[in-house]
């Protein structure tokens, strides 16, 4: 199988060649931990891509949110079009975890909405890891959560080959055993249907279907096909086999399930006896009723709501043993890349404690067995022990990464020649009037402004005041979802408005070359939002523009300000010296506007589609549904999940309205 093949029109420049060489050599020498300290806009992702090509290791990239993960996924997919680049994040569009509030005696049942396309991408990631070595998986912290055993997932897969003897009923049973459902009407992922001697399977992790044609009890022909058009894509040759992987990550052979059910019953008996001995009759009755219902559902259907809470029994783990996460699907020699490590590592650290705190009340009050504790994310120590080799990527790595790393590789020079922005300190008195003056000067030049405040109230008041002053301004806060955030940034770049006000959302991952001025209000208020690392990250937002500058409004120079200025000036001097030596004139980055995730509002899409449908015949409406399905699959393939979801809802509306 071919290895990683980097495809790019660009050659490494500035500090990139040296960073690539040092990191690659460090990995080849067996260094376990390294830091890539790369300034904003220095091309850290391109550097990492080159390192992956050099060392040829399966790679897991962890980002601290879905937005950054999607951005990295798109970039790596462009760099490695001939390799398996996968996306593994939480598949919930909406998630309300199960919880119990003792103070008000309120039980909150688990409620969730699963994004089917992201679920497919998760399954595709594990499939690629089992089948090949040239795999990059871009993930959020979902990668440390329990997803079941890779050995069972591999062992339960259905392998088919032309000429094999297999009865229809046996094949149906094998598919149902790995969570496929029979559906002779709709071509839904994770389903199969039968027409005479032809069985069509729609794998949960693929966009194509598998057509199995039987002659008696013998497989006569196997081919892949387009689920929308039904046309054959490719025929599986006689010597080759095709593997149909389970439709869910949690799977188990029947004999193992019987053993697991016995283990659950034994734990139930022990816990009920404990509750009764403590005279907690209500809790014991509640636990008995709930657990026995779950056991009956598992016996009859092979599944129950909340089955993951019994995963320790199904996996054969002992109490306290680490769960099987995505990391178990990687080979031992994998490479780990942690993006924005100063944020991502604390996030990984916090996952386990938060999960345990929520389950404590559920277990104490008889809603769950104690084994529910073991359906959990990895602790940080468990995660750390699973690391083979790691690169921590950040413009401001934390003391932890710096302390455990054998090498810190700096990437200070940007390929564009851009230098870190000039930073000015101005008094807090009259900071708003001064800010307005600077905004007007910057706006006249056709540039944009970012303003960061300390509190939500201050951001709202400032936005309102700037609007009264005739300034085109928007406010971005934490309640804004990912899609709307992307649209706000796009509108800022397009010049729909000139100033964006925020609190903590204007730091990592905000790439806006049009921004020439960053204002940090109340910069002298020591704390998380005005720490050395936060200040450096925020100031870095002006580093993609050749005319970029920063103003810190402060009544005094704090230790954080002093340290941030010292580091920024150090980097700036290195960059200026490099440019002078090589005759480089800094040029503002010219970055094309990305397509909008959703081109029209949802309501407009629905009314437009239904309005058109009113004038069509039944056959034309059916054709329209087929076209919309093809468009939905294309949108999902391009990671335009919100558009795909809108199209999916349009299709449902059409089917319901016209009884299709």
From Swiss-Prot:
Its main location: cytoplasm. A motif (Beta-hairpin) lies at residues 91-114. It comes from the Archaea. CDD domains: DEXHc_UvrB, SF2_C_UvrB. GO terms for biological process: nucleotide-excision repair; SOS response. Keywords: ATP-binding, Cytoplasm, DNA damage, DNA excision, DNA repair, Excision nuclease, Helicase, Hydrolase, Nucleotide-binding, SOS response. Residues 622-657 form the UVR domain. InterPro entries: Helicase/UvrB_N (IPR006935), Helicase_ATP-bd (IPR014001), Helicase_C-like (IPR001650), P-loop_NTPase (IPR027417), UVR_dom (IPR001943), UVR_dom_sf (IPR036876), UvrB (IPR004807), UvrB_inter (IPR041471). PROSITE patterns: HELICASE_ATP_BIND_1, HELICASE_CTER, UVR. One of its GO terms (cellular component) is excinuclease repair complex. SMART domains: DEXDc, HELICc. ATP binds at residues 38-45. It is found in: Cytoplasm. Residues 25-183 form the Helicase ATP-binding domain. SUPFAM superfamilies: C-terminal UvrC-binding domain of UvrB, P-loop containing nucleoside triphosphate hydrolases. Signal peptide: none annotated. Residues 431-593 form the Helicase C-terminal domain. GO terms for molecular function: ATP binding; ATP hydrolysis activity; DNA binding; excinuclease ABC activity; helicase activity. The beta-hairpin motif is involved in DNA binding. Belongs to the UvrB family. Forms a heterotetramer with UvrA during the search for lesions. Interacts with UvrC in an incision complex. The UvrABC repair system catalyzes the recognition and processing of DNA lesions. A damage recognition complex composed of 2 UvrA and 2 UvrB subunits scans DNA for abnormalities. Upon binding of the UvrA(2)B(2) complex to a putative damaged site, the DNA wraps around one UvrB monomer. DNA wrap is dependent on ATP binding by UvrB and probably causes local melting of the DNA helix, facilitating insertion of UvrB beta-hairpin between the DNA strands. Then UvrB probes one DNA strand for the presence of a lesion. This is UvrABC system protein B. It comes from Methanococcoides burtonii (strain DSM 6242 / NBRC 107633 / OCM 468 / ACE-M).
């Amino acid at each position: 199988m071919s290895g990683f093949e980097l495809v790019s029109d660009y050659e490494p420049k500035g500090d990139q060649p040296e960073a690539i060489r040092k990191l690659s050599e460090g990995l080849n020498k067996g260094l376990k931990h390294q830091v890539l300290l790369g300034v904003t806009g220095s091309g850290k992702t391109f550097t990492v891509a080159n390192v992956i090509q050099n060392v040829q290791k399966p790679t897991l990239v962890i980002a601290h949110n879905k937005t950054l993960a999607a951005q990295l996924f798109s970039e790596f997919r462009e760099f490695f079009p001939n390799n398996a680049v996968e996306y593994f994040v939480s598949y919930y569009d909406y998630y309300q975890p199960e919880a119990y509030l003792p103070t008000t005696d309120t039980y909150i049942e688990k409620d969730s909405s699963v994004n089917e396309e992201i679920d497919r991408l998760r399954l595709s990631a594990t499939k690629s890891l089992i089948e090949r070595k040239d795999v990059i998986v871009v993930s959020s912290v979902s990668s440390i959560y329990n997803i079941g055993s890779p050995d069972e997932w591999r062992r339960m897969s259905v392998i088919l080959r032309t000429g094999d003897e297999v009865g229809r009923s046996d094949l149906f049973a094998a598919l149902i055993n790995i969570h496929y459902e029979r559906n002779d009407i709709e071509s839904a992922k994770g389903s199969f249907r039968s027409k005479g001697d032809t069985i069509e399977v729609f794998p949960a992790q693929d966009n194509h279907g598998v057509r199995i044609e039987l002659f008696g009890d013998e497989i006569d022909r196997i081919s892949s096909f387009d689920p929308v058009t039904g046309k054959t894509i490719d025929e599986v040759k006689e010597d080759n086999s095709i593997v149909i992987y389970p439709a869910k990550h949690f799977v188990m052979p029947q004999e193992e399930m019987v053993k697991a059910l016995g283990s659950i019953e034994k734990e139930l008996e022990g816990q009920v006896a404990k509750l009764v001995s403590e005279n907690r009759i209500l809790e014991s009755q509640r636990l008995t009723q709930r657990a026995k219902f779950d056991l009956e559902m598992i016996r009859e259907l092979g599944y129950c709501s909340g089955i993951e809470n019994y995963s320790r029994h199904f996996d054969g783990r002992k109490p306290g043993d680490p769960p099987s996460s995505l990391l178990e699907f990687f080979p031992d020699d994998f490479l780990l890349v942690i993006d924005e490590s100063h944020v991502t590592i604390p996030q990984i650290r916090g996952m386990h404690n938060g999960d345990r705190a929520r389950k404590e009340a559920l277990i104490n009050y008889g809603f769950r067995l104690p084994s529910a504790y073991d359906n959990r994310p990895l602790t940080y120590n468990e995660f750390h022990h699973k690391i083979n080799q790691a690169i921590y990527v950040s413009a401001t790595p934390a003391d932890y990464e710096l302390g455990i790393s054998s090498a810190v590789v700096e990437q200070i020079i940007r390929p564009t020649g851009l230098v870190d922005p000039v930073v000015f300190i101005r008094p807090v008195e009259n900071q708003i009037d001064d800010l307005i003056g600077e905004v007007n000067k910057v706006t006249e030049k056709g540039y944009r402004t970012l303003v960061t405040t300390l509190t939500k109230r201050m951001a709202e008041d400032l936005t309102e005041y700037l609007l009264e002053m005739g300034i085109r301004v928007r406010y971005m806060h934490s309640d804004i979802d990912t899609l709307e955030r992307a649209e706000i940034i796009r509108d800022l770049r397009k010049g729909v408005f000139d100033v964006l006000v925020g609190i903590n959302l204007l730091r990592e991952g905000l790439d806006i070359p049009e921004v020439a001025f960053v204002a940090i209000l109340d910069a002298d208020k020591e704390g998380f939002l005005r720490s050395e690392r936060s200040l450096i990250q925020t100031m870095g937002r002006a580093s993609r523009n050749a005319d970029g500058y920063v103003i810190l409004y402060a009544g005094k120079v704090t230790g954080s300000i002093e340290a941030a200025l010292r580091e920024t000036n150090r980097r700036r001097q290195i960059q200026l010296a490099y440019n002078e030596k090589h005759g480089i004139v800094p040029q503002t980055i010219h970055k094309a506007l990305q397509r909008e995730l959703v081109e029209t509002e949802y309501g407009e899409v629905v009314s437009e589609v239904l309005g058109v449908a009113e004038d069509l015949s039944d056959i034309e409406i059916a054709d329209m549904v087929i076209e919309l399905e093809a468009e939905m699959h294309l949108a999902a393939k391009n990671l335009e999940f919100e558009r795909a979801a809108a199209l999916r809802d349009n299709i449902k509306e059409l089917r319901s309205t016209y009884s299709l």
